[in-house]
């Protein structure tokens, strides 16, 4: 009997371990894909909460605020880089992949974070920067000093300056080159980012092996997944034209297989700002690549829609990349730790977004984006609510940025992307409750409409009408609507400019969401199944007439309706 059961058990195990390539969303296997219905909260340890008065946030401070995150409704935290680093690029210049920056704490503190988060049902993801190291990393220092070093070919070198030495820069307007001369090595090294961030050469099998050791190490520490930084550059073949690079697409499924082998539930979230026709190179045709990716393409047209009220390009941007493997998922966001990248828009479209949301040069960055927080950029509570209601109702997983739940502002006096990386504002006390230090490592916003005395967690917790309490409610609502993350979806035709109506179906549930991008109230009509719908926000009923759903929606208004099923 045992011998007869063994092949069956092995077959079942293999079925659950492999990606599903053709299966409807009704399948029970999708219930195990936790990343399809989680709420992700992105933060930097250094700007979140200081526990010891050093002026810099730390792991113990984060542990102290886990109950706050639980109350907010967060079940996944994505940590920005916290490994040892010279911090010339806010930690994205790693000098030791296997450690904790002592500014933030110790390995013991990290273990306690894993334990306390797990107790509360919170998963911890981490940023992993495998594309490049710091130029202070021992690998690079040894590589530059000794051409016969085993680490020399961890990087890409050229004795002569390549003809495309000043092309393919990640930060145009700030960078001057992508090949920089190193005097000690008497050679040029390749770097897509700043010159102190030399790119690793993933065509070298030793680099791939080392990257797996790094991933395995952190999986052993208890993390539930990785936000994989700069994926298109990781798979780039050195020496190819950086404007039209060649890619080794086998690297992505190789990383996926290793991560799945070490932890079958671990997630890989890819940062790949690519065109829709390239998506399956990263997801994999059968779902063997990245589990999830940020939808940068839709994000750019979303901001165009918010700026102009013209949502036709946004609708197209939602539809174009929808054909992805069933086990894959899009991650939607409004703001992240970088600039709002508008590089895919036409120059005319980009100028319209600039005029509305970033008219001053100090608000713009890298000739392609805006370096502002959402609240001061939109400048309108109704529009802010509509934008977040939209985020939580888009067909994927929502990712929010720390502080956006209270409408934090930005500090444009800070360099480049640091404008949106200011300390969290917990109260109206000293340094916004972030730190008891006389001086914080980065200034807390203390002047203007978004000063910590006016915008902080404590004040909003006491105010039932606050943005914080509104956000708690919309997150709770999103968790009650699994059809958004798992169901089939379509965009319904209304004939009303500026109004987006989406329908979701999962099993016997139908959800309809309505969002008005317009500055004026509008009446909307569309075809809908069933006869009665319950308004999940206002808690009243709406009836269709002859299959037509008619509703009036105010400027920047939004509604969520669930079809009532009567048997």
Where are these regions (language model features)?
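Active-site and adjacent substrate-binding regions of carbohydrate-active enzymes
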Residues: 22-567
């Amino acid at each position: 009997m045992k011998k007869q059961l063994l092949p069956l058990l092995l077959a079942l195990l293999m079925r659950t371990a492999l990606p599903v390539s053709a299966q409807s969303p009704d399948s029970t296997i999708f219930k195990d894909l936790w990343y399809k219905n989680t709420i992700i909260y992105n933060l930097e340890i250094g700007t979140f909460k200081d526990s010891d008065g050093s002026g810099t946030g730390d792991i113990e401070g984060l542990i102290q605020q886990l109950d706050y995150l639980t109350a907010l409704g967060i079940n996944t935290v994505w940590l920005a880089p916290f490994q040892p680093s010279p911090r010339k690029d806010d930690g994205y210049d790693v000098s030791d992949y296997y450690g904790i920056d002592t500014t933030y704490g110790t390995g013991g503190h990290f273990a306690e974070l894993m334990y306390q988060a797990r107790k509360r049902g919170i998963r911890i993801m981490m940023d992993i920067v495998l594309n490049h190291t710091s130029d202070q990393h021992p690998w690079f220092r040894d590589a530059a000093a000794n051409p016969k070093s085993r680490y020399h070919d961890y990087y890409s070198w050229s004795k002569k300056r390549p003809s495309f030495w000043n092309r393919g820069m990640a930060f145009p307007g700030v960078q001057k080159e992508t090949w920089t001369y190193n005097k000690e090595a008497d050679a040029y090294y390749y770097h897509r980012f700043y010159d102190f961030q030399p790119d690793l050469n993933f065509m070298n099998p030793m680099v791939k092996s080392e990257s797996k050791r790094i991933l395995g190490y952190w999986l052993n520490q208890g993390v539930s997944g990785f936000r994989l930084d700069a994926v298109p550059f990781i798979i780039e073949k050195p020496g190819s034209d950086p404007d039209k690079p060649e890619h080794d697409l086998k690297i992505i499924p190789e990383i996926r297989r290793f991560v799945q082998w070490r932890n079958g539930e671990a997630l890989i979230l890819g940062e790949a700002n690519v065109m829709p026709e390239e998506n399956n190179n990263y997801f994999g045709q059968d779902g063997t690549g990245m589990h999830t990716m940020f939808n940068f393409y839709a994000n750019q047209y979303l901001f165009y829609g918010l700026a102009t009220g013209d949502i036709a390009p946004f609708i197209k941007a939602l539809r174009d990349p929808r054909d992805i493997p069933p086990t894959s998922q899009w991650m939607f966001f409004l703001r992240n730790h970088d600039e709002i990248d508008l590089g895919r828009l036409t120059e005319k479209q980009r100028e319209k977004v600039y005029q509305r949301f970033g008219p001053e040069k100090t608000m713009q960055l890298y000739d392609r984006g805006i370096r502002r927080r959402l609240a001061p950029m939109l400048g309108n509570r109704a529009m802010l609510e509509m934008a977040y209601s939209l985020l939580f109702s888009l067909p994927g997983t929502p990712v929010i940025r720390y502080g956006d739940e209270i409408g934090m502002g930005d500090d444009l006096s800070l360099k480049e992307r640091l404008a949106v990386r200011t300390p969290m504002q917990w109260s109206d006390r000293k340094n916004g409750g972030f730190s008891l230090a006389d001086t914080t490592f980065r200034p807390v916003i203390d002047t203007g409409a978004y000063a910590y005395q006016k915008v902080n967690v404590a004040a909003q917790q006491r105010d039932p009408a606050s943005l914080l309490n509104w956000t708690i409610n919309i997150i709770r609502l999103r968790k009650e609507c699994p059809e958004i993350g798992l169901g089939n979806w379509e965009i319904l035709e209304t004939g009303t400019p500026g109004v987006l109506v989406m329908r979701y179906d999962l099993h016997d549930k139908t959800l309809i969401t309505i969002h008005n991008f317009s500055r004026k109230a509008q009446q909307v009509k569309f075809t809908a199944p069933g006869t009665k719908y319950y308004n999940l926000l206002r808690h009243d009923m709406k009836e269709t007439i002859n299959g037509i759903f008619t509703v009036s929606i105010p400027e920047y208004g939004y509604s969520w309706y669930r079809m009532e099923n009567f048997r």
